[in-house]
Structure formats: structure tokens, C-alpha cells
């Protein structure tokens, strides 16, 4: 019987000679089979080959990038689907209301009461929205949210994006949970400088169709001496707020809106006085009052206290959207749990990071540079002045919950108690929050008592140097010079050189601020004492403490 020899190519090499090759001799009439353990690949000419064309394995970096891409794609897909479903749901509701307002072929028209309720609900939805224009192109949604959040909880921010330039078009719509928040934002944010520009805040263009209903709601609200209070500290209770505002008159009710899931208040509420003058005095005196490190936002209520007028909550999402969001969130959470376990095991492997969800930053890694977006103010330099602190060394009594183990915490507690005993004699130790929560306060001293209850703010470790250099004097050596000079007073975490333009004009003055972050507050005070009033290059330097909360929130404009 005739035989035939079949030479196979493996990894691009022709069999034969000294190169490794696979060959098989089979009878002419027999069916050839690949060796055991190999895969057969069908070629274009119909022939089979036993060679397995394997791709090179992915490197750890490539695997990590692939996981990031998958996670980011999932998040964007979920966000897109939810937005589309929400818009479709709202449009459907509006269509149903419009169709129900007229006589339909197979049904009855809405009753006058139902029609009025639908119109009011529509008016409330419009009252909750504000238009924000003249937004600097480098500012993103996070900056807008941070600027407008003090007035009340934000439901959504809609920024219009240019698909060609991939930048927003300079305007946005901010939707709050309650109309009073939008009204306060309209009154207090118009013409405020944000990112070097005076933003424009107004009502959406479609408010005209609902203006009669809005005027009617405002007229009904005047019958109640209610005020709206926002930016309330999370540690304050209804009774605390009531005791503060009782100084202006007798209060009929004081209620903070609460999250039904967590039971915590949402940072805003309503207070109703017995007299109209009391509400006017409270608004004029307490608006922008610093209570526990947060500036209260206080204004007149623009809607009557009727449960039927409560705006729709996010719980009105379509069931399909809610299910999709829950399933996707669970999947992402599971991925993060796996990534977190990997971080615990290696203490050096970066976790999966996405624009929306990030793992906790390991202790010992210097914080990211403060990229404040107050453009055209520009950060020209951020210099870490020392290497990262090893993970095994706790810094200033701060313990990262991801890396800390129970024995370590147990060892740190006695040390913390000893430090408190050394800092405060028994007669001078500050009262704890739990010891003060049952105190009774009222009248004009209530505000100070509540502030004392909340006064647990961390001392600032940031120093700002003003009037030190001109913009033209900034060079590559300035950061190093500042770091070296300030290093005489303590360990410098970082140095930020920030240029801030004082207007929108092209020739507007630019001032330079230099921010120096130390490891502890005592080093900051030592540096300020030494540098304040010192002359540098013919200029008298002004050294001051900078607010830690502003610095942590990337706000370098103060």
C-alpha cells in the first residue's frame, strides 16, 4: 500500500533538518489523526493541522489595563442605559399627563383635582432646576457639583458635550431635590467667579409655561412662616438646629429631611416660626453663618408644606433600570472585593482604578497633587519633598483600615490615651461629643454652644506664602528653593506653586501663591513664625495658615 509523508509547520518553522518538526506517515487510504494532546485547525484549503498557534501570554501590566478597560466600559454602559431609561421614563410620564388632560377615545379625562396635582408636580420639577452658563472649559462635573452642593442635595447634573472636541459646551443644568435649594443657588451663585470666570445662573427657558403655577405656589407659601436651611453639619440633630434658631422667635416645627435607608439627615430641613418677623430675622442673620465648620445656607421657603408637593425621588426609576443598576453594582462590588484581596496579599499591587470607583489609597503613598481647577489660575509645580513613608510606620496616629490589623490597633490605643493625658490635664480635657449630646441650650448662646460641640476640626498643616514672587520670577529652581528653606522647620509633604488670575481680562493681574504642606501642625506654625514678614527678592513675604478643608478639597482660591 502506498504511503505519504506529511510535514507540518509548527510556530512558523518548516519541518526537516535540525529544526524541530512534526511528521507522520500514514497509509494512503487511512484517515490521519493529530497526535494526542494537540488541537486541529481547519485551514482555508480544507486541510487540518495539528499545530496549535498559541498567542504570547499577557503581561501583568496588560492584564491590569484589560481589566480597567472592561470595568470602565461596564460603568459607562450602565450609566448610558440608566440615563436613557430615565429620560424615556420622564418623557412617558409627561406624555401620559398631557394625554390624560384631554378626553381620550376609551377613557375619561382627569378630574380637576388630579389635573391640578399633575400641573403642580410639573412646576415643581422645573423649579428644582437651574441653568449654569459661562463655565470654563477645563471645569468638569465634579467642580460644578462641589460648588452647588452646599445649597442642597443634587439629583443630577446635565452637561452638554461636543462630540468633536470632547469638551463641554460651557453650560449645564443642575437639578436639586427641592425647589428651595435651586432658589438659593440662583440667588447666591449668579456672577460668582468659578475657574476665573463669572458664571451665569438662571432658570431654564421652559419655566414660562409653568410660571402661573409657580406664582400660585409662592403665594401659598407666604401663608407659612417657613425657612429653608441647608449645609447642616452631619453631627447636628433636629434639636440642635432648633436650639440655634430659637433665638429669633418661637418655633412651631423644625424638621431635617432624612434618608430612609440610613436614617441620617440629608443636610437640609425646614423651620416654621409663629411670626413672620422671626423668619425674616433668621434668614438675614443665619445665612452664611459658620456652624461647625460649614456655612449654613438659609432662605425663605418657596413652596407650602404639603406632602403632595414633594418632588419625585430617584426611586421612580423604571424597574428595568433599577434591576440593571443593582446587578451591575453587585458585579462591580465583587470585582473590587477581589482586587482588594489582591492588594491585601501583595501590599504593592495597584488595584483596579476607574473614573467612578477607586480603591482606598494605601498608607505611605503621598497624596495626589492638588489639581485645583480655578483656571486660568495655573498650578505650575507640585514637589514631593520626601520619599513615601513605609507602610509599617504609622504616621501621626493615623491608621489605614485596609492595612491595619487588630493587634496593631490594640497597641495604638494605649499610646493614644497616654498622649491625650500628656496634652490635657484632667481638669482641662475637652468634653467628648457623647458627653455633650444631652446638654440643653437655647437663646442667643445656642449657636456658640453648638459650635463648641462640633469644634473637633483638625489643625491645619498647610502654610500659604503670599507676595513672595512675581509670575515672571517663577522658574524650575523655585520649588526646590522653597522646599529646602521650609525643610528647616519640619518634614515637607509637598509644595504647590499656584498662579491665580484676578479677572477675565487678558491683562488682568496674576498673583502667585505658594502652598507648603507639612507633616504636623506644629511645624507649620514654626515655619510661619520664621517666614512671615521676611524679605525675599525685595518683597515682604506674608506667611499664613491655610484652611485644611479647603486645601483637601482642592480649593486654592482663598
Swiss-Prot record:
Question: Phosphoserine modification sites?
Answer: 111, 243
Q: Where is this region: Inhibits transcriptional repression, interaction with ERCC3 and apoptosis induction?
A: 76-558
Give start-end of the signal peptide.
Answer: none
Q: Basic and acidic residues bias: where?
A: 426-436
Question: Example GO biological process term?
Answer: regulation of alternative mRNA splicing, via spliceosome
Extract the ranges annotated as region (Disordered): 415-436
InterPro entries on file: Nucleotide-bd_a/b_plait_sf, PUF60-like, PUF60_regulator, PUF60_RRM1, PUF60_RRM2, PUF60_RRM3, RBD_domain_sf, RRM_dom
Q: Is Lyase one of the keywords? A: no
Q: How does it assemble?
A: Homodimer. Associates with the spliceosome. Found in a complex with RO60 and Y5 RNA. Found in a complex with FUBP1 and far upstream element (FUSE) DNA segment. Interacts directly with ERCC3. Interacts with CDK7 and GTF2H1. Interacts with SRSF11/P54. Interacts with ARGLU1; interaction may be involved in ARGLU1-mediated modulation of alternative splicing.
Q: What does this protein do?
A: DNA- and RNA-binding protein, involved in several nuclear processes such as pre-mRNA splicing, apoptosis and transcription regulation. In association with FUBP1 regulates MYC transcription at the P2 promoter through the core-TFIIH basal transcription factor. Acts as a transcriptional repressor through the core-TFIIH basal transcription factor. Represses FUBP1-induced transcriptional activation but not basal transcription. Decreases ERCC3 helicase activity. Is also involved in pre-mRNA splicing.
Q: What is this protein called?
A: Poly(U)-binding-splicing factor PUF60
Source organism per UniProt: Pongo abelii (Sumatran orangutan)
Q: Which gene encodes it?
A: PUF60
Amino acid at each position: 500500500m502506498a504511503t505519504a509523508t506529511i510535514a507540518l509547520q509548527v510556530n512558523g518553522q518548516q519541518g526537516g533538518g535540525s529544526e524541530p518538526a512534526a511528521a507522520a506517515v500514514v497509509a494512503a487510504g487511512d484517515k490521519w489523526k493529530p497526535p494526542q494532546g494537540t488541537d486541529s485547525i481547519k485551514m482555508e484549503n480544507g486541510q487540518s493541522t495539528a499545530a496549535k498557534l498559541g498567542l504570547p501570554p499577557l503581561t501583568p501590566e496588560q492584564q491590569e489595563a484589560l481589566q480597567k478597560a472592561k470595568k470602565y466600559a461596564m460603568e459607562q454602559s450602565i450609566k448610558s442605559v440608566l440615563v436613557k431609561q430615565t429620560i424615556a421614563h420622564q418623557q412617558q410620564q409627561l406624555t401620559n399627563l398631557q394625554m390624560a388632560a384631554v378626553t381620550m377615545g376609551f377613557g375619561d379625562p382627569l378630574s380637576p383635582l388630579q389635573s391640578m396635582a399633575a400641573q403642580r408636580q410639573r412646576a415643581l420639577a422645573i423649579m428644582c432646576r437651574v441653568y449654569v452658563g459661562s463655565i470654563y472649559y477645563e471645569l468638569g462635573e465634579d467642580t460644578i457639583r462641589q460648588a452647588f452642593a452646599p445649597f442642597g442635595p443634587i439629583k443630577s447634573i446635565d452637561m452638554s458635550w461636543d462630540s468633536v472636541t470632547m469638551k463641554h459646551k460651557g453650560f449645564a443644568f443642575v437639578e436639586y431635590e427641592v425647589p428651595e435649594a435651586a432658589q438659593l443657588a440662583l440667588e447666591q451663585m449668579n456672577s460668582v467667579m468659578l475657574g476665573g470666570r463669572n458664571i451665569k445662573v438662571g432658570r431654564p427657558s421652559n419655566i414660562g409655561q409653568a410660571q402661573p403655577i409657580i406664582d400660585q405656589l409662592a403665594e401659598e407659601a407666604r401663608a407659612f412662616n417657613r425657612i429653608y436651611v441647608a449645609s447642616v453639619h452631619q453631627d447636628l440633630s433636629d434639636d440642635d438646629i432648633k436650639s440655634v434658631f430659637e433665638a429669633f422667635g418661637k418655633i412651631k416645627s423644625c424638621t431635617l429631611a432624612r434618608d430612609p435607608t440610613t436614617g441620617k439627615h440629608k443636610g437640609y430641613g425646614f423651620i416654621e416660626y409663629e411670626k413672620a418677623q422671626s423668619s425674616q430675622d433668621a434668614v438675614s442673620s443665619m445665612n452664611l453663618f459658620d456652624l461647625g465648620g460649614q456655612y449654613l445656607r438659609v432662605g425663605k421657603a418657596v413652596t407650602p408644606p404639603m406632602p403632595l408637593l414633594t418632588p419625585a425621588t430617584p426611586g421612580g426609576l423604571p424597574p428595568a433600570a433599577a434591576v440593571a443598576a443593582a446587578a451591575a453594582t453587585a458585579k462591580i462590588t465583587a470585582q473590587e472585593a477581589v482586587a482588594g484581596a489582591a492588594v491585601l496579599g501583595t501590599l504593592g499591587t495597584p488595584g483596579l482604578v476607574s473614573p467612578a470607583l477607586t480603591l482606598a489609597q494605601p498608607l505611605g503613598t503621598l497624596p495626589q497633587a492638588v489639581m485645583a481647577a480655578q483656571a486660568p489660575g495655573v498650578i505650575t509645580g507640585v514637589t514631593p519633598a520626601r520619599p513615601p513613608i513605609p507602610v509599617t510606620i504609622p504616621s501621626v496616629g493615623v491608621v489605614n483600615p485596609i492595612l491595619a490589623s487588630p493587634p496593631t490597633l490594640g497597641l495604638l490605643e494605649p499610646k493614644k490615651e497616654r498622649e491625650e493625658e500628656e496634652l490635657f490635664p484632667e481638669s482641662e480635657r475637652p468634653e467628648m461629643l457623647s458627653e455633650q449630646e444631652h446638654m440643653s441650650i437655647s437663646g442667643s448662646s445656642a449657636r456658640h454652644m453648638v459650635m463648641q460641640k462640633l469644634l473637633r476640626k483638625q489643625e491645619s498643616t498647610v502654610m500659604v506664602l503670599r507676595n513672595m514672587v512675581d509670575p515672571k520670577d517663577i522658574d524650575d529652581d523655585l520649588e526646590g528653593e522653597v522646599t529646602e528653606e521650609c525643610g528647616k522647620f519640619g518634614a515637607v509633604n509637598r509644595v504647590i506653586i499656584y498662579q491665580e488670575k484676578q479677572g477675565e481680562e487678558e491683562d488682568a493681574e496674576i498673583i502667585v501663591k505658594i502652598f507648603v504642606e507639612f507633616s504636623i501642625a506644629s511645624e507649620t506654625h514654626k515655619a510661619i513664625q520664621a517666614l512671615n514678614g521676611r524679605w525675599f527678592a525685595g518683597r515682604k513675604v506674608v506667611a499664613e495658615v491655610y484652611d485644611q478643608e479647603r486645601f483637601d478639597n482642592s480649593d486654592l482660591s482663598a
